[in-house]
């Protein structure tokens, strides 16, 4: 039989070793990785016994005159920029931070490999340039996990723990919690890596930047499952910019072949769907709806721009075997940012059919380019209703969706669809980012 552990006073609990604390934490709060000692105490001890490292670091920084350094994680995008929506966000924010950096902070981009710890890189210049030394924190420094670095956090957990012990704080950008919420939409490997990534965040993070109020609510619910009191970490909703041009390197080469493929679409009107091909994005729903529209005699192209994702064998086969593939059903799987901008310029409208999103960057990018948007009626898309977005029912059948597309198309051509551009750009996003991680101190 297991021995029951009890504590007569809170101070006895506060001084208990981690191995004993793990025996009293509720089983439902345990995850793949045990919480480290400081998080265990935050989960189960009264507040009067806890001190916040971030507060101490800020006080030291203010008193000794040290100019803090912001280390920005670009471990994925610096080695392989696949051009996804998440990577456009990472690139846009990183470039905006570099543009707006002033004398209050040192800004350094960092990367890591399996066998090499986080170190400074000279991004966006050629990979491999930069420092060979691992980064170390001074009090008041901040590590910002801007990139979606699922594996590098696990590989270099010890380095990040030391960064925090040395007086630095750790912040992370969270795009969505979908692999945890809907594992059936993702590969088992992605689900496992995402779960371990969440374990790392629960163990290490001082704060989180979320791309929407929905993502923030989902994250808070996840952290509650770890038993972490909400007073012991911070969250902030970061408004997203919309201008794809601001997410491009100034010297980024243009893919002439990509632009030629896009230009060829201009001969006939088309609707555009942007995003990685994956189950939740609604590509099959659109194909079935357009089958109905084409059967009615509607001569309108449907264009997909996005790379092949996961668990999409049926979708992949449906596209390639479709009678209209290459004619009225077009799939472009390798389009750079310049090509995407041109596609948005030429299209008649953008359809956002995702069943779930953390934010929905293609929607806001389309509005930023003045294009009408028809979106699935889910809460995260309703936030943009005042900008002129039209909606179709979340559970629409192919016929219902076809009807909504046809009505929307007729309204566009009648001049009855008014679109307003979003007000927030990437520079404004960066200002809010710095207010969140520094307590309203300016970049």
Language-model features: locations:
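Carbohydrate transferase catalytic cores enriched for Leloir-type hexosyltransferases
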Residues: 2-443
